[in-house]
Amino acid sequence: MEKCFNPETQIYSSHRPPVNFPTDPKLSLTSFLFRSSASYPNRTALIDADSGQTLTFLKLKTQVSKLAHSLVQLNIKKNDVVLIFAPNSIHFPVCFFSIAALGAITTTCNPSYTFTELSNQAKDCNPTLVITVPELWEKARKLNLPAIILPSPSNSKLSSKSEFWFFSDLTRKSDRFSELPISDVRQSDVAALLYSSGTTGKSKGVVLSHKNFITTSLMVTSDQDRYGDPQNICMCFLPMFHIFGLSVIAYSQLRRGNGVVSMGKFELEGALRAVEMYRVTHLFVVPPVMIALAKESVVVRRYDLSSVKEILSGAAPLGKNVMEQCARNVPGAAIIQGYGMTETCGIISIEDSKKGCRFSGSTGMLAPGIESQIMDTKRWNPLPPNQEGEIWLRGPNMMQGYLNNLEATKSTIDEQGWVKTGDIGYFDEEGQLFVVDRLKELIKCYGFQVAPAELEALLLSHPEILDAVVIPFPDEKAGEVPIANVVRSPNSSLSEEDVQRFIEKQVAPFKKLRRVTFVSSVLKSPAGKILRRELIQKVRSKI
């Protein structure tokens, strides 16, 4: 334990060997991505499981370079914001890398968002261009922004007051554009604005730099480098609009020279077919997918999954029985857990798969370069091993702050650079991190964040609702689902279905209320603060 816990400073560090992070200040995540790829130009970089299309590392660099030159011709400049509103495909990372190559900034948005949700994000970050697909055009066109349509002209007619271009046309330029354009990009420049609810409240733009992505990529693949493993083939059905899909899978794996199999939307048999067809070695999943792999034994065993070496789950803790059943269904794979946040560019800790399946509930050791303190939530002093407190973090992968929100930034990052996660956890004597509870009020539904405050605000906008509280409810498939306690006005005849429909029209499907209970009052403290934790305990005691 001496190696990872300093009793004098009360700071935890990683057992893993240190990583040499690049010190050149003039470095973009895109130039770092292709730093080594010249030595394996014909190696497969991206495979689209939906279309069968593939890109070698040479073709990937060529497409990124040509699109970057096209963006310059479309007058996209350093610090301009480009919104990607699209599902996973091999074109998604090409767009991200091209935008970053110019020093422009990518923001991403969940394709299931309503136009209101999309518009709210656009108002906050002020994009100059949107990249989308024909299926989402009816929402995207209402932003009245110039647009790029993925991937190519389709049979559907796209009406718009704004200009738009097709991705396939923009990447069909002359070979003289096959090198990245010269640009003045520094590691400290902003690369992405990914939206997160943080520790509480409405969605906020997390400001992530090129350095954040570069250092994260080295942390994520440090065990592969340490053990000298050859090229991995990684499945990516987790959304690339989310930090895990974009940073931990797409960017980090490609930067290491690993292959990535992209899938637009998760469907169990489709994913298993892709694993079998492309000999996928690494699966990155969230608990609902792990539960499917564990419980759908007949389906899972129908496919040849012998290539799978590792299944990594994040987003929420897994039960031991689920992990053990998954290990029985995919016997060649190490079943491990990891922990990350948007604010940490996706990585905090991860189990070492070479040490076998522990099934302990641990999220593993800290990634190299990250420090942690466990803070007593009453006295706010750091704690030694085996004592629970709020997890605080520091490292080169930590966000710069929240966009246009100095108050939230100051409440999350202290003067010494510690990022307060809002999660409760502890380290054991071996330096393994356990996440046991959340201070923050977020609901994790199918791995997505649902902010109770957002749904409560919508509920209170209804003329017949006087008060409301939204809390998580355990669900075997989703992990948690949002449910609501609602106080109706005296003469209201609102039904549960009325309230559910009212919310459903305004939010993405994963935010829908699964249950509404009418109550006479919402449980609050004398100061008027919702006693959310007590309410959660009360509801769960009745299960």
UniProtKB/Swiss-Prot annotation:
GO cellular component, one term: cytosol
CDD domains assigned to the protein according to its UniProt record, in alphabetical order: 4CL
EC number of this enzyme: 6.2.1.-
A Gene Ontology molecular function term of the record: ATP binding
Major localisation: cytoplasm
Keyword terms of this UniProt record: ATP-binding, Cytoplasm, Ligase, Nucleotide-binding
Binding sites annotated in the UniProt record for ATP: 196-204, 337-342, 423, 435-438, 529
SBD2: annotated span: 338-402
Entry similarity comment: Belongs to the ATP-dependent AMP-binding enzyme family.
Region named SBD1: 267-337
Signal peptide residue numbers: none
Protein localization: Cytoplasm, Cytosol
Organism: Humulus lupulus (European hop)
Domain comment quoted from the record: Both substrate-binding domains (SBD1 and SBD2) are involved in the substrate recognition, and are sufficient to confer the substrate specificity.
Pfam families per UniProt: AMP-binding, AMP-binding_C
Protein's name in the database: Probable CoA ligase CCL10
Keyword Iron-sulfur included in the entry's annotation: no
SUPFAM superfamilies referenced in this protein's UniProt entry, alphabetically: Acetyl-CoA synthetase-like
